[in-house]
Amino acid sequence: MKKLTLREQQLVCLNILDYFHALCERYKISYSLGGGTLIGAIRHKGFIPWDDDIDVYMHRDEYQRFVDVWFQETHEHYNMETAEDILAQYTGEMAKIFDCRTQITDAKGRKSPMFMDIFIYDGVPNEPKIIYPLMKKHRRIKLRFSSCKKRWLRAKENTVQKAILNKLSHFLFSKMQKNLAQFQIKYPIKQCDYIGLVLSDYGGWQKSYMPKEYFNHVIYKEFEGRQFQVMNGYHEHLTQYYGDYMKLPPEEDQKPHHIQEAYIL
């Protein structure tokens, strides 16, 4: 195995993004660079110098189209973990695309291939004051499921405890998925003025939704010498989420936050 420098890690992530982007372009699927990756595109025209991952955003319907396309094709070096996979690291919250030729140890000591995150936006109520109670309800179920799932996966094999936690985890997973499906029927994106990350705590609930007009369509912005899709209201979104996003953080915060070490296998 070869240990990767930060820049080499970034280039692996960039290759994943290139692969994802090419598939989206081929099938006319929309997405947007998100989070620190979006800041990087606008402020640095590439990675934030100390960043070590890639984030993208997708509307639910575009995400579902992408999943359908992904599993119709074969991918030599890449694997996708969907948000609907009960064994996913962040079931319900996000999807991931992994480069199976690599291995990382993250800040919590967990090992996995290097990956790109896909955050999924659903329609949410047009009245912001009722968004939080609804998100809180759905996230409460998700937290119960996540807690049970951890105990299930850690329990000893071939024990009564393992069997009980298995059944309970699947019950809570089904309940979470059913509730989310009902939510999506009640608040279809096309009829909503706001979109949000219903099951994700990414940034706290106040920052996990935005006016749909920020992400009505996409434009293209430079990132590492390439052109990638970016939401039309990127400035408004980044200002809502980060404030003065063009200002560099304090020097002591200018360091990688996700990966402890990374290797090419």
Curated annotation (Swiss-Prot):
Keywords linked to the UniProt accession: Lipopolysaccharide biosynthesis, Transferase
An annotated Gene Ontology molecular function: transferase activity
Regions annotated as coiled coil: none
EC code(s) of this entry: 2.7.8.-
Disulfide bond positions: none
GO biological process: glycoprotein metabolic process; lipopolysaccharide biosynthetic process
Transmembrane portions of the chain: none
Leading EC class: transferase
InterPro entries for the chain: LicD/FKTN/FKRP_NTP_transf, LPS_cholinephosphotransferase
Task of the protein: Transfers phosphorylcholine (ChoP) from choline diphosphonucleoside to the lipopolysaccharide (LPS).
Protein family per UniProt: Belongs to the LicD transferase family.
Further information: Lipopolysaccharide (LPS) is a glycolipid that is a necessary component and antigenic determinant of the outer membrane and has been shown to be an important factor in the host-parasite interaction in a number of Gram-negative species.
Name of this protein: Lipopolysaccharide cholinephosphotransferase LicD
Gene: licD
